[in-house]
A protein has these predicted regions:
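Extended, low-polarity segments enriched in aliphatic/aromatic residues
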Residues: 2-62, 68-69, 73-80, 86-297
Length: 297
């Protein structure tokens, strides 16, 4: 694959006309992202909606600026994100209506964007398109959110962020995870990769570390599981693997509360990062060459 040119705009500004909004508009044309769009194209602008009451998401003005230029090129943009894989107290985008409420909380609405704001994988996160990835290192297929897969062009509008699996998230993570349906997220998190005896995605359990009912978060842990596979009593935690659908809610809840009774296996992370790149390739394969542009803040 040929090396791609990367443009950089300094965030420093001596006056208001040098702020990030006009710089983003200038960069849109300097990087020739306008050439991705033909008149009448349906254009997915893939962002991250953020999580409820958290501030690590793009400012709406930065997204609206790109929407305006896509429309100026004759495109028909829509701003989108997907539902999350996990169902737990720290996630506010597990289903479509909650995702849109979170988007509105952060200023991503049709009124502020000047275009529709949609959940690309549908209300339940199961609206997808299966895509073969022949060159994938680990994954040979991806399940791309339908609204993205059916778009004519895409602007991948990312921002730098931390991520518990990827460590660092940018443009690859924004579509490698954020461009997948729930089924795609299960797949790329390696929940069902390998033989049942060595699924890398299965949680590593250390029941001897569980405080049982003495843990102040034991009710939160139980409530985090949408399948009732996780139960805590005075003897500690009990896990029913047959009920588990590998949404990682128990692991993330336990880890985020500072405990390590349910964690990822040590060798999980490098493989998951490779799978994420394979999944991102799957998203790219749904578009014709030259129909995707990437921009990161």
């Amino acid at each position: 694959m040929a090396k791609q040119k990367v443009w950089f705009a300094d965030a420093n500004a001596a006056n208001w006309v040098e702020s990030l909004v006009p710089k983003a508009k200038d960069l849109f044309y300097e990087a020739k992202l306008n050439e991705c769009i033909e008149k009448g194209d349906s254009v997915a602008i893939k962002i991250h909606f953020g999580e409820w009451n958290r501030t690590r998401c793009l400012r709406p003005e930065l997204v609206a600026a790109i929407v305006e230029e896509v429309k100026a090129c004759g495109g028909r943009p829509f701003v989108c994100d997907t539902t999350t894989l996990t169902y737990h107290a720290y996630s506010s985008r597990f289903i479509g209506n909650l995702a849109l409420e979170t988007a509105a909380r952060h200023g991503f609405t049709e009124a502020s964007m000047g275009c529709p704001v949609v959940v690309a994988d549908g209300f339940s996160g199961d609206d997808d398109v299966r895509v073969e990835v022949p060159t994938g290192v680990l994954l040979k297929e991806a399940y791309v959110a339908a609204a993205i897969a059916h778009a004519d062009a895409m602007i991948n509008l990312a921002h730098a962020k931390g991520h518990p699996v990827a460590s660092f998230g940018g443009c690859i993570k924004n579509i490698g995870i954020g461009g997948q349906s729930k089924r795609g997220k299960y797949h790329e998190h390696l929940a069902h990769w390998g033989s049942p005896e060595d699924f890398l995605g299965w949680p590593a359990r250390y029941p001897e570390k569980c405080l049982g009912l003495d843990c102040p978060f034991h009710k939160l842990c139980e409530d985090s599981c949408p399948r009732g596979a996780y139960h805590i009593d005075e003897k500690g935690h009990h896990f029913d693997a047959e009920k588990c659908w590998l949404c990682y809610s128990c692991q993330i809840t336990c880890m985020f509360t500072g405990h390590e009774c349910m964690v990822f296996t040590p060798d999980y992370f490098p493989y998951a990062q490779i799978a994420m790149a394979d999944a991102a390739k799957g998203v790219m394969l749904t578009f014709e060459e030259g129909k995707v542009g990437h921009m990161a803040y």
